[in-house]
Regions:
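Hydrophobic alpha-helical segments
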Residues: 1-153
Length: 153
């Protein structure tokens, strides 16, 4: 896989500055950082963004996330390792990431309403939208994850 463009950050600098400002706001939001990491990794898995998976798994581990929970994240529905709050966030992540298929079901929203305050509901939805923007940019430009020293067997 070859990158399609390597200087896209410079070519759309004002847009990327706004995206980085959004990330700073999300960091300061009332959402727990480990929950946001789970959301970012799960959306990135669905979108097939190796660059973002690599980044957000690394950040989650650095912030103290358990490696087993990250390994099982794609199968979260079949694991007891995720709290009801995390399960609501992950279901909402999948619903919004796959919105053309799911149409953001009312039952997923009801779980979000039950687990999160109104402020957190807004921030969670923004966090999901933000990672989907990043995924589409990185996948679209075929950004290479930095683990290039590893090779396929």
């Amino acid at each position: 896989m070859s990158p399609r463009m390597t200087d896209y950050f410079k070519r759309a600098e004002p847009a990327f500055k706004a995206m980085f400002s959004l990330e700073a706001a999300l960091t300061a939001s009332p959402l727990d950082a480990l929950l946001v990491h789970l959301v970012k990794v799960r959306a990135s898995q669905i979108n097939g963004c190796a660059y973002c998976i690599h980044m957000h798994v690394g950040e989650a581990l650095k912030d103290g996330e358990d490696p087993t929970r990250l390994h099982l994240l794609a199968g979260w529905r079949d694991s007891s390792l995720y709290s009801p709050r995390e399960r609501a966030a992950l279901a909402w992540t999948e619903a919004l990431t796959l919105v053309a298929e799911t149409h953001a079901p009312d039952e997923d929203w009801a779980a979000v309403e039950a687990a999160f305050t109104p402020d957190e509901q807004a921030w969670l939805t923004i966090a999901i939208g933000a990672i989907n923007i990043w995924n589409r940019v990185q996948v679209g430009f075929r950004a290479e994850h930095p683990a290039t020293q590893l090779h396929a067997a």
